[in-house]
């Protein structure tokens, strides 16, 4: 079980990413545009660097909704492999059953 502070930190990162997404994409478009002058490009780079570090999407980590576990995360279910297995064994996930061959 992850600490509550880790879960809260991830929630904060998710909120920051959503808050600064438009500004970040606009600045990146200016930086990657070949017709932009060097001064404008440099200003955009400085503004991008001034944004909060946690507003970058690559700093986010997928975590289990139940336990907060960062490893073994299954995107389709939003849970770790352990909790998916437990829920499947209890029949809580429709259409999911244990494989047998």
From Swiss-Prot:
Q: Which InterPro entries match?
A: Ribosomal_uS14, Ribosomal_uS14_bac/plastid, Ribosomal_uS14_CS
Any one Gene Ontology biological process term?
translation
Coiled-coil residues: none
Against SUPFAM superfamilies, the record matches this protein to: Glucocorticoid receptor-like (DNA-binding domain)
What binding partners and quaternary form does the record give?
Part of the 30S ribosomal subunit. Contacts proteins S3 and S10.
Q: Which GO terms describe its molecular function?
A: rRNA binding; structural constituent of ribosome
Q: Which cysteines are joined by disulfide bonds?
A: none
Described by its record, this protein's role is as follows: Binds 16S rRNA, required for the assembly of 30S particles and may also be responsible for determining the conformation of the 16S rRNA at the A site.
Q: Does the keyword Ribonucleoprotein apply?
A: yes
Q: Which chain regions cross the lipid bilayer?
A: none
List the HAMAP family hit by this protein, alphabetically: Ribosomal_uS14_1
What keywords were assigned to this record? Answer: Ribonucleoprotein, Ribosomal protein, RNA-binding, rRNA-binding
- Tell me the protein's name: Small ribosomal subunit protein uS14
Domain of life assignment:
Bacteria
Q: Which GO terms describe its cellular component?
A: cytoplasm; small ribosomal subunit
Q: Which family does it belong to?
A: Belongs to the universal ribosomal protein uS14 family.
């Amino acid at each position: 079980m992850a600490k509550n502070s880790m879960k809260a930190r991830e929630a904060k990162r998710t909120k920051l990413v959503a808050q600064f997404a438009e500004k970040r994409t606009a600045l990146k478009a200016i930086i990657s545009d070949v017709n932009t002058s060097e001064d404008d490009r440099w200003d955009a780079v400085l503004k991008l660097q001034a944004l909060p570090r946690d507003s970058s999407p690559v700093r986010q980590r997928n975590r289990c909704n139940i336990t907060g576990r960062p490893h073994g995360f299954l995107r389709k279910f939003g849970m770790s492999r352990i909790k998916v297995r437990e829920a499947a064994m209890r029949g809580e996930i429709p259409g999911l059953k244990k494989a047998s061959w």
